[in-house]
């Protein structure tokens, strides 16, 4: 995966503020333990450059970038120290142009049509939206995604563990940024286990897994109809007929053929099928590419290759 794909697969980009470079590697390891393999070390402190260098040299599994980059000098220093991506709070043409010309991934802050058009002119399709809470949040980005359908946003400021799922579910969101998963005070106090826990919680909230329905395989349409009639008779579950299956309420899908899975299938809803597929792949659970369905270029459904207790698993976009 390239840098942009790594950021998207992470879902959350921790904004890390370090007062002492000695804490950099421990923080990176805490993030990795929580399932987050990207981090943005900000130039808000004098320890930024040394911190980036320490992580780049000691944590090969961590994609480290530099944040709060507001000058070309900072940009060059960050890349010299090993930063693989640059994040700016605003749009600075000099910084962005240098990054583009030197093959460095860059995400400038863009909250207006003029700034977005300037970024597009330099070939960018992902921009930072900061501070998201101040500039209208999801509703503002949704409005901007109308004329700028090819642009995706990384909102920072106003995103937290309670609303991350809502952001990730939006098709115009690339990832989210925030410091809530690695509070400065916890870094200073050495509370790295807490940081790992916060990262795991953020990832879980971003994915938002929940059971959608259970699928039951039947030999044919008549058998499926008989099962649904029995469920309706016993439990008053409303029946809805479809082309390839019938539903008894929204929780039970009765297939009109012997479909995927020895015993049937389990459908799992998620805020992002693409994010779920990437995360599950890291755990060794691949998806069946031939089963993937797309809408407007976004994956909306896919089956995993593995069966669980004889059940196929179907991922669905919320």
Residue ranges of model-derived segments:
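N-terminal beta-strand motif that seeds the catalytic metal site of vicinal oxygen chelate
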Residues: 3-17, 203-228, 261-268
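Conserved, mostly hydrophobic/aromatic
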Residues: 14, 31, 78, 127, ...
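Catalytic beta/alpha-barrel core
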Residues: 15-17, 37-45, 62-70, 75, ...
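Core segments of cupin and vicinal oxygen chelate
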Residues: 27, 44-46, 215-253, 276-282, ...
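Catalytic cores of alpha/beta
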Residues: 27, 71-81, 114-122, 139, ...
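Glycine-rich phosphate-binding active-site loops on the catalytic face of alpha/beta enzymes
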Residues: 89-95, 128-138, 172-195
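C-terminal helical cap(s) of enzyme catalytic domains, especially alpha/beta-barrels
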Residues: 99-104, 185-208
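Vicinal oxygen chelate
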Residues: 251-256, 281-318
């Amino acid at each position: 995966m390239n840098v942009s794909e790594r950021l998207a697969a992470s879902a959350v980009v921790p904004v890390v503020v370090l007062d002492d470079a000695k804490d950099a590697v421990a923080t990176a390891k805490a993030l990795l333990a929580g399932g987050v393999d990207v981090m943005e070390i900000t130039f808000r402190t004098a320890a930024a450059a040394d911190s980036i260098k320490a992580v780049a040299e000691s944590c090969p599994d961590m994609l480290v970038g530099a944040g709060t980059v507001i000058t070309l000098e900072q940009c060059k220093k960050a890349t010299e120290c090993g930063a693989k991506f640059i994040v700016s709070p605003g749009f600075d043409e000099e910084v962005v142009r240098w990054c583009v010309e030197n093959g460095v991934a860059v995400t400038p802050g863009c909250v207006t049509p003029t700034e977005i058009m300037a970024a597009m002119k330099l070939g960018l399709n992902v921009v930072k939206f900061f501070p998201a809470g101040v500039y209208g949040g999801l509703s503002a980005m949704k409005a901007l995604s109308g004329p700028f359908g090819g642009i995706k946003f990384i909102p920072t400021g106003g995103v937290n563990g309670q609303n991350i799922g809502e952001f990730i579910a939006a098709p115009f969101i690339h990832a989210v940024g925030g410091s809530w998963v690695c509070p400065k005070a916890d870094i200073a106090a050495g509370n790295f286990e807490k940081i790992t826990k916060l990262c795991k919680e953020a990832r879980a909230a971003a994915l938002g897994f929940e059971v959608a329905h259970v699928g039951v395989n039947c030999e044919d349409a008549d058998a499926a109809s008989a099962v649904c009639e029995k469920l309706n008779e016993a439990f008053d579950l409303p029946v809805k007929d479809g082309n390839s299956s019938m539903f008894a309420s929204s929780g039970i899908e009765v297939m009109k053929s012997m479909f995927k899975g020895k015993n049937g299938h389990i459908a799992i809803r998620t805020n992002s099928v693409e994010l779920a597929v990437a995360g599950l792949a890291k755990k060794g659970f691949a998806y069946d590419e031939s089963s993937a369905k797309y809408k407007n270029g976004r994956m909306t459904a896919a089956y995993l290759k593995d069966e669980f207790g004889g059940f196929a698993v179907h991922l669905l976009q919320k």
